A protein has these predicted regions:
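Acidic-glycine-rich active-site phosphate/pyrophosphate-binding loop
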Residues: 1-5, 147-154, 221
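Glycine-rich anion-binding loops of enzyme active sites
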Residues: 2-14, 39-134
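Alpha-helical scaffold segments that flank or form the walls of functional sites
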Residues: 19-36
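Short, solvent-exposed amphipathic alpha-helical segments in soluble enzyme
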Residues: 20-24, 107-108, 130-133, 177-185, ...
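Alpha-helix C-terminal capping segments
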Residues: 31-39, 179-184
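Glycine-/charge-enriched secondary-structure boundary and capping motifs
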Residues: 51-75, 82-87, 159-160, 165, ...
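Active-site glycine-rich loop that binds ribose-phosphate moieties when present
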Residues: 92-102, 136-158
């Protein structure tokens, strides 16, 4: 038996290069399927684009998204575009999962270990990029991380008993961990000294290069 997964996600540009942005947005949308233990099968583009912006930029965004969908082994079956003052891109993704191995973002148990598949700090590095204060090493690292599919991690976790799982995105580790703990009627203890972070994140944070959403996440967590 198979269960159907349907999800969507889109956002404004987080990279200067439109091709990179397309890949990042697609990887982000596909991640929701992997977080549930599923396999993406088809995807539809979700696009908002300004009428006075070079259409070649849109072409590069779509090319990046298409390449990432292909990398995931899924089929890009079309999409929809609207006119907007700010470009936005993402995907609606359809996938399948074995209902006996469907991972939810609740059900964590006492004694469970928290495992991260990627280093933290993308929001801080992107803030440094916008301020033109980023190092080249940090720029390359954050782009590689955001473009990387969680497919391999998903396949590894299928070999183990997983009680709860989520993907860490806009609400950060604190927000998503809190959400999972509350839904599981548990608390979570995090040793911040052991958290993996992207290059130069601590330096950027000490400079005050922290996205506004991080403060809201802290209040929630």
């Amino acid at each position: 038996d198979l269960a159907l997964i349907q999800t969507l996600d889109f956002f404004t540009p987080v990279a200067d290069d439109p091709y990179d942005f397309g890949q990042i947005a697609a990887a982000n949308a596909l991640s929701d399927v992997y977080a549930m233990g599923g396999t993406p099968k088809t995807a539809l583009n979700i696009v908002a684009f300004p009428k006075d912006m070079d259409v070649e930029i849109l072409g590069e965004i779509l090319r990046g998204g298409a390449d990432k969908v292909m990398e995931a082994g899924a089929v890009l079956a079309g999409g929809h575009t609207i006119q907007d003052d700010t470009p936005k891109y993402g995907l609606s993704v359809t996938g399948f999962v074995d209902p006996r191995k469907f991972w939810k973002n609740f059900g964590a148990q006492t004694g469970d270990k928290l495992i991260l598949t990627k280093a933290l700090g993308a929001g801080i590095v992107n803030t440094a990029i916008k301020a033109d204060l980023v190092t080249e090493g940090a720029r390359k690292a954050v782009l590689a991380s955001m473009k990387k599919l969680n497919r391999d991690a998903c396949e590894v976790f299928k070999e183990f008993e997983v009680h709860a799982r989520t993907d860490v995105t806009g609400f950060g580790l604190g927000g998503h961990a809190t959400e999972m703990a509350v839904a599981s009627d548990r608390t979570v203890v995090i040793d911040t000294e052991k958290l993996p972070v992207l290059p130069d994140v601590e330096e950027f944070a000490s400079m005050g290069l922290i996205p506004g959403g991080a403060y809201r996440n802290r209040e929630f967590a």
